[in-house]
UniProtKB/Swiss-Prot annotation:
Subcellular location: Cell membrane
Protein name per the record: Protoheme IX farnesyltransferase
Region (Disordered): 1-25
Sample GO molecular function, one term: protoheme IX farnesyltransferase activity
Keyword Nucleotide-binding: no
Species this protein is from: Mycobacterium ulcerans (strain Agy99)
GN (gene name): ctaB
PANTHER family xrefs: 4-HYDROXYBENZOATE SOLANESYLTRANSFERASE, PROTOHEME IX FARNESYLTRANSFERASE, MITOCHONDRIAL
Length: 324
């Protein structure tokens, strides 16, 4: 303040800066919070499955000779489709997400994003992914992506999830589609190796999901979702986990004629390791011991990544296939 009762120019600027800085910080925090909320709707961790399985499928389709631009465009389109499906799944499951401890922090469960905005966001991602794949790859891959979203939202989320304990068995087919999309983006068709990769993920999904659901079975009971561990005994669940683990390993071995020796060796060794864990879980339950199903859940991720990474390396370096 000057001696004449006036505010000095420097003081005005300083005061303005002091008033604007908190507002700027708050505005930035709100924007960042909104961006992170929309990102969380897409379930980025789930999208990792796309990267782990789609790239090896594309490399196998052309024995490593596929153009990098095709890979990039397919991954972008595939990730948008997966993000759209996951967002729409969050919209449909908002009511049960509020009840379950594991999902209570999801954006719609805590009202961080308006439901209508999330719905528009999910639909927009789905439509854009279809046209992206159609224009950058081919119509078949775009249609497969569109069918995947529709199946995941309407068949799994709205029809199966709340009605049957076999929900993840049949609903898990949506998670198998990245290999089909990747293969079709490169070749424009579908062939038996793509179906074999589909089978690997199809059979892998139940033991992977049920192992996690065993840990959170009380959540599913509270939400009224008939996930197998919530409606069956631990012995019944672990027996089913063991059966599907065997089917998973057999499916990986069925793919060996189209792959090279590296994949065959890794599939055999990793399969033995995966089976050992499943047998240990089942044996522990039968013996009445305290078991740790979450360990199988976490290691099942490593198993799938290891098998498909071996397939990618095998295809990229062009090792001779077992078919010659």
């Amino acid at each position: 303040m000057s001696v004449h009762g006036r505010v000095a120019p420097g003081q005005v600027a300083g005061t303005a800066r002091q008033r604007s800085e908190p507002g700027t910080g708050t505005w930035r925090s709100r924007v960042l919070g909104t961006v992170l909320a929309y990102l969380a709707l897409t379930k980025p961790r789930v999208i990792e499955l796309l990267l782990v399985t789609a790239i090896p499928a594309m490399l196998l389709a052309d024995r490593g000779a596929v153009h990098p631009l095709i890979i990039a465009n397919t991954l972008i389109g595939g990730m948008m489709a997966a993000a759209g499906a996951n967002t729409l799944n969050c919209v449909a499951d908002a009511d049960i997400d509020k009840v379950m401890n594991r999902t209570a922090r999801r954006p719609l469960a805590r009202a961080a994003v308006p439901t209508r905005s999330a719905l528009i966001f999910g639909l927009a991602l789905t439509v854009i992914s279809f046209f992206w794949l159609w224009l950058s790859a081919n119509l078949l891959s775009g249609l497969l992506a569109l069918a995947t979203v529709a199946f995941y939202v309407f068949i799994y989320t709205l029809l199966l999830k709340r009605r049957t304990s076999q929900n993840v068995v049949w609903g898990g087919a949506a998670g198998c589609m990245p290999v089909m999309i990747g293969w079709s983006a490169v070749t424009g068709t579908l062939a038996w190796p793509a179906l074999a990769m589909f089978a690997i993920i199809f059979f892998w999904t139940p033991p992977h999901t049920w192992a996690l659901a065993m840990r959170y079975k009380d959540d599913y009971k509270e939400a009224g979702v008939p996930m197998l561990p919530a409606v069956a005994t631990e012995r019944q669940v672990t027996k089913q986990i063991l059966i599907y683990t065997w089917l998973t390993v057999l499916a990986t071995l069925a793919l060996t004629p189209a792959a090279g020796w590296l994949y065959a060796a890794v599939a055999a060794v990793a399969g033995a390791w995966f089976l050992t864990m499943a047998h240990q879980l089942y044996a522990g339950v039968r013996a009445g011991e305290a078991v740790k199903p979450l360990r199988l859940f976490l290691q099942s991720n490593n198993y799938l990544a290891l098998v498909f990474c071996a397939l990618a390396v095998d295809s990229a370096i062009g090792l001779p296939t077992l078919l010659g």
